[in-house]
From Swiss-Prot:
One of its GO terms (cellular component) is cytoplasm. The active site is at 99 (proton acceptor). It catalyses: (R)-pantothenate + ATP = (R)-4'-phosphopantothenate + ADP + H(+). A monovalent cation. Ammonium or potassium. It is an enzyme of class 2 (transferase). The keyword ATP-binding applies. InterPro entries: ATPase_NBD, Type_III_PanK. It comes from the Bacteria. This is Type III pantothenate kinase. Keywords: ATP-binding, Coenzyme A biosynthesis, Cytoplasm, Kinase, Nucleotide-binding, Potassium, Transferase.
Amino acid sequence: MCLLIDAGNSRIKWALADTARHFVTSGAFEHASDAPDWSTLPVPRGAWISNVAGDAAAARIDALIEARWPALPRTVVRASAAQCGVTNGYAEPARLGSDRWAGLIGAHAAFADEHLLIATFGTATTLEALRADGHFAGGLIAPGWALMMRSLGMHTAQLPTVSIDAATNLLDELAENDAHAPFAIDTPHALSAGCLQAQAGLIERAWRDLEKAWQAPVRLVLSGGAADAIVRALTVPHTRHDTLVLTGLALIAHSA
């Protein structure tokens, strides 16, 4: 049994896995929220941790583990040149984020023998190009949908700051009034829809460019907390998989 922890910038996801492909239980919590209830969980043989949220998150994770399972072995996952069938095409492999690395491993296992474009939607939107043979060819990083909207609100004099929940409601209203209207007629709707279309445009352009470059079909795989909203703006085929990082961590743990 392995404890898997994926600490992102917005929240911490975790799972207990008894094999490389099966989660016994899982959950998620915000960085500032109450601790998860691990009191009934069996003792794992160790914890495998991907943390891109910094030192404060690392200290909290250590404290949570120590409170429930003192002295439990912990492995902080870092990207390497090759692991679990994936080779790292980064110029400096160790500089690739651990979440992106684990996600690549999870995606390669889930969609074996397929070329992939993996789009993950969190605080940042990341795109990873993964060949069918497991070679990570490179990626793109852009502000996430929420960060785009928040940045416009913070760094302009007259634009509002719109949250994801508010933007989703605004887009629902826009769709109900005219599902085919390409442009909004007020600022909050325009900001919400514009930032959403920017996300969709990035993804669709990258997907088309990758299929052209590789001269082969590429599966577009979507993951992350903001995927529900962004899916509505996409016009290309796609597949959802919301546990890529945890799946990759499970594979890393069971290969140790």
